[in-house]
């Protein structure tokens, strides 16, 4: 039986940071460990946290906005670091794991001050600011892609490709396989645009569908996430076209909708890309053009090169090109199925387990474990001394 250890996770206040942290927490708790998570107020409002997860809010100012903003941010980070040291002294984690974002920084700095092993996980194909700062200082860097931009030179040996943790419901879709499509059968299209939808998708996708032949419109079913402001106009356009469509500002049952879909049109956030690849769903990606360091464009490189997706810069995302791609996939089942296989080849369904294995590997064994594995008293005493040295 695995001995219980304590792990402290720290993540920024967005779903992109929090959901992988929740997934790792779930896995570590299932392995019998005790897990705590540090974030900000915004992060801890994101649903999906395991019931057994302990949560803490620490100050973590953002160092930006001119000299005064930098000073306020630095003072908040310093205060957060001091409070994180107190938390670490009390919780006694074997390892501290950061998931990026400014709220992860105080805990990682405190872990360094208290000589705790540190692991960071980067969800995107471009290392974020906090992870870029911490990569030279931590023990391991878990990444989701083979090619990582802005990774500090000289620290490549710390890099471990684990992938982005995905939900068990998504892994189950992969195991079920791709839904068959007959040449004259229903073609199911899922359109998602980040947490609250994207206006560009609400404008371009219905216009593209309007260009399809009548025979294909009769076979088409659409589920589309829309911004509240766009909702009625998109519904009206599909009704005018006679297309069976369901539109909503938020897709609550996303795994079930993904299982249903033959193809997806989406933004290119790290979680979305990971889930589509794991499920094996062909996609048209429209990376958000204002993402930090253009990381969404880099997130889809592997999938596009494998043939499981195509990607448009937002300025090139025009109805005629989108219609052409939808039509080809809908009328050529062989092409669609091959794209699905190529997408699945980029999926990493064991990402959560692999990340948990990596994190556990840096946890010093508890004293009783060392005693149990010792063949003799001298060996046990030697093991205890080594474990204490590692834990310092």
UniProtKB/Swiss-Prot annotation:
Gene Ontology biological process terms in this record: carbohydrate metabolic process; cell division; cell wall organization; lipid glycosylation; peptidoglycan biosynthetic process; regulation of cell shape
Organism, scientific name: Sphingopyxis alaskensis (strain DSM 13593 / LMG 18877 / RB2256) (Sphingomonas alaskensis)
Family per record: Belongs to the glycosyltransferase 28 family. MurG subfamily.
Name recorded for this polypeptide: UDP-N-acetylglucosamine--N-acetylmuramyl-(pentapeptide) pyrophosphoryl-undecaprenol N-acetylglucosamine transferase
Entry keyword Coiled coil: no
InterPro entries for this protein: GlcNAc_MurG, Glyco_trans_28_C, GlycoTrans_28_N
Underlying gene: murG
Keyword ATP-binding: no
Keywords: Cell cycle, Cell division, Cell inner membrane, Cell membrane, Cell shape, Cell wall biogenesis/degradation, Glycosyltransferase, Membrane, Peptidoglycan synthesis, Transferase
Function: Cell wall formation. Catalyzes the transfer of a GlcNAc subunit on undecaprenyl-pyrophosphoryl-MurNAc-pentapeptide (lipid intermediate I) to form undecaprenyl-pyrophosphoryl-MurNAc-(pentapeptide)GlcNAc (lipid intermediate II).
Broad class of enzyme this protein falls into: transferase
Catalytic activity, EC: 2.4.1.227
Membrane protein topology class: Peripheral membrane protein
